[in-house]
Amino acid sequence: MLIFDRSREGRACASLFPQTPADIRGLPGHLLRQTPPPLPEVTELDVVRHYTRLSQKNFSIDTHFYPLGSCTMKYNPKAANVLARQPGFAALHPLGTERFGQGTLSCLYELQEYLKTLTGMTAVSLSPAAGAQGEFCGVAMIRAYHDARNDHERNEILVPDAAHGTNPASAAMCGYQVREIPTNADGDVDLEALKQAVGPKTAGIMLTNPSTLGVFEHRIPEIAALVHEAGGLLYYDGANLNAILGKVRPGDMGFDVIHLNLHKTFSTPHGGGGPGAGPVGVNARLQPFLPLPMVARSGNGYRWLAESDRPQSIGRLSAFAGNVGVLLRAYVYIRLLGYPGLRRVAEYATLNANYLQKRLVEAGFDTAFPARRAAHEFILSVQRQKKEHHVTALDFAKRLLDYGFHAPTVYFPLLIPECLMIEPTETENKETLDAFVDAMAAILKEAAEEPERLGQAPHCTPVRRLDEARAARHPDLAWKPAAPVPPR
């Protein structure tokens, strides 16, 4: 039921009205509504009960284990939310003068410096508003670098076949042709195939390390040397930085440009479509091309860098400084943990992943790369169960909902058949991990004894299994007011 379905004429929720009505004097008449908007007429109690009931039907990090692979669904500390909502931060308008925003500018400047230290980069821009935008920005800087050198023959970006789907999309948006590099039997980039691919057309390579296969790229120094010798650059997709935070830095591996997902590694809330933050970091050769705005020191204070300060900048990704509320939460998270705490993030994330992987293998599951240890996540394949019992990865994921666990990522990476990608993160305790193993083991037994039960799951959720094909082809995404009843 929608909130509109609870509407009854004459009901109101006056306690939630704005304290100061908007002043519409001076607005042109043609911009003003002639009729009231079709908003629901409900009481405060109606509103509270409606949204409380909805929250109880949902999975969330605050209520459930959320092992969504490649998403780092860790707990978001409430202290970061409280501090980022302070009036001094929240009431600052982006068009306000620098003089009245020195506190915010100070935090953003320090965040830039922290991210430089953690990644081994020369400079950082906070302006990208999401990971995919950070990717686009990074590839755009690679293009600007080659164009500035009149090296226009470089029209290819190399992308591993296990990469995030946004990697080839970002490269294509910047006008590059995408050349796919296969993965070898151990889960690493096939070095021989890479040697055949690099050449005078190579603008760069996009890598995630650890990769989306959940393993650390063993031969990253050799990859960096190959691409650099060919005149290309290395792009680091920071989706999996949680596994190496404070342990090893992308800059030290040879990467020239990176993007970070603050809404993942640095624990800002995500999962509802945004907002996110995807800062980019670069080494010295790409520093002139960083997007604006950026924060710089100015005497005893701080200021925004403008286009006149960076004439070679690729420009702006948005009118203002990205999602500042998200940036502030990440800043507080770093300050709360400190460098030793950030190292423990990586240690506990990898410990939890390896413990969970070992327990699930003991329970009878197959991993994608049995000879490799997990980084911060790992991949199971239920292809054997599909052949023997006609159950799929989707069936396992749907059935997990009945046991009170959010489903892992399914069918990604694409090269692993019937896969579930599981990322427990560092914030889960052993009891939760053991309960998840027990649920998976019970489902594995059901797959052999009652496969049809899995095929119809979930059974205990407010909404049962959907017709996903129909939902994709005929989406119903917005409420529309009913047509007025014509007079008799």
Curated annotation (Swiss-Prot):
Catalyzed reaction equations: N(6)-[(R)-lipoyl]-L-lysyl-[glycine-cleavage complex H protein] + glycine + H(+) = N(6)-[(R)-S(8)-aminomethyldihydrolipoyl]-L-lysyl-[glycine-cleavage complex H protein] + CO2
SUPFAM superfamilies given in the database record: PLP-dependent transferases (SSF53383)
Enzyme Commission number, as recorded: 1.4.4.2
InterPro entries the UniProt entry points to: Aminotrans_V_dom (IPR000192), GcvPB (IPR023012), GDC-P_C (IPR049316), GDC_P (IPR020581), PyrdxlP-dep_Trfase (IPR015424), PyrdxlP-dep_Trfase_major (IPR015421), PyrdxlP-dep_Trfase_small (IPR015422)
GO cellular component: cytosol; glycine cleavage complex
HAMAP family noted in UniProt: GcvPB
Protein name: Probable glycine dehydrogenase (decarboxylating) subunit 2
Organism, scientific name: Methylococcus capsulatus (strain ATCC 33009 / NCIMB 11132 / Bath)
Gene expressing this chain: gcvPB
